[in-house]
Amino acid sequence: MAWSLGTLRVTSHPYFRLLIPFLTVLLQCYGVWAFCHQFCYLQLYQRRNAKGACIGLIIVVLSLTFLIWYIWALMLVLGPGRQPTIPPFKIIPDSEIRTVSSESAVPDNSIAPPDIYPCDERGYPIWCSNCQSLKMSRTHHSTKVGYCVPRFDHYCVWIGTVLGRLNYKLFVQFTFYLDLVVLILMISIATQMRQMKGSANGNVYAVFALACCALLMAGPLFLTHIYYMCYNRTSIEIIEVNNKAKASRKFFCIYNPCDGYRYVIQFCPGENQDFWNKGNILTNLKEFLGPNYLSWFIPSILTHKQSYGKSSANYYDLIGDCNEVMSEKFQKYMIDKIERKEYVTRLVV
């Protein structure tokens, strides 16, 4: 037990979290040097006299490597995004609020709630005591960064940062270009294996093995997150669904325009919790990658700038880009549960 607690303290230390990204950069530098000098220059340029192929491969690999580092830097600089401070919702009717006197009354900074919001079994929205703010849908408080992250995905030890709504697209681009460059390394060396027999430096075979390992790790990672985006899921949501030990009940409070009441709907572990899937793969992808197809492949700080909206007493102005929209199909499913009287409680508006 003491050993596990000591290990936890070490792995959570900021310097330890920098160690793996630092080692990753060193391996990348070694791989680029071994490929460009030991393979391209010594094997292709000097031994095979393939000057065009040598220069072309060096330019492509160096360009992709610098692009990967640029994306990495953007992920660190931008961060995962921070949910704006959301004041308490006004869920109790004014007629039920009692004040002792006008002199002792506390100024009311509460705002009208949205039509749907995550809550507890009594209909109260989730409060983050660290950020002194309500936590909206898909938002989780991260101890790594010290604030609530909208559309929290996971903490990546390899790049050393938390992934959320703001830098998730960059992470997908990072894994895509990393897969691309290691594929180029593998294919280029594999096609020359027979000709290099007995003449190649050990560094060439080392970088080939390194590229194979990188592809085995980054390839499935990229495809997994493409799958998640196609169905509008995050890593933490998939873990909660698949891991029964971490599964928990979900509660949403929804306004029913038919009778003017708010209803608290419960979703148990194992029950359908596909809240955000819009039913169309392209629509789901656009929610993560944006509407501009070209920006899916071109990383830019401009396309990742987050807007919190204007300061206002209106929830949608406050939440800005962090607002998560539940699918129409699931909204209808919740209304159907209300009609079947499958709700926890009802609130007067």
UniProtKB/Swiss-Prot annotation:
Transmembrane regions: 19-39, 57-77, 170-190, 204-224
Report keywords, A-Z: Acyltransferase, Lipoprotein, Membrane, Palmitate, Transferase, Transmembrane, Transmembrane helix
Record localization: Membrane
Membrane topology type: Multi-pass membrane protein
Q: Which GO terms describe its biological process?
A: protein targeting to membrane
Domain DHHC residues, every copy: 126-176
Question: Out of the domains of life, which is the source?
Answer: Eukaryota
List the InterPro entries: Palmitoyltrfase_DHHC (IPR001594), PFA4/ZDH16/20/ERF2-like (IPR039859)
Domain text: The DHHC domain is required for palmitoyltransferase activity.
Q: Which family does it belong to?
A: Belongs to the DHHC palmitoyltransferase family. PFA5 subfamily.
- Tell me a GO cellular component: endoplasmic reticulum
Enzyme Commission identifier(s): 2.3.1.225
Q: Which Gene Ontology molecular-function terms are recorded?
A: protein-cysteine S-palmitoyltransferase activity
The name of this protein is: Palmitoyltransferase PFA5
Positions annotated as active site in the UniProt record: C156 (s-palmitoyl cysteine intermediate)
Q: Which reaction does it catalyse?
A: L-cysteinyl-[protein] + hexadecanoyl-CoA = S-hexadecanoyl-L-cysteinyl-[protein] + CoA
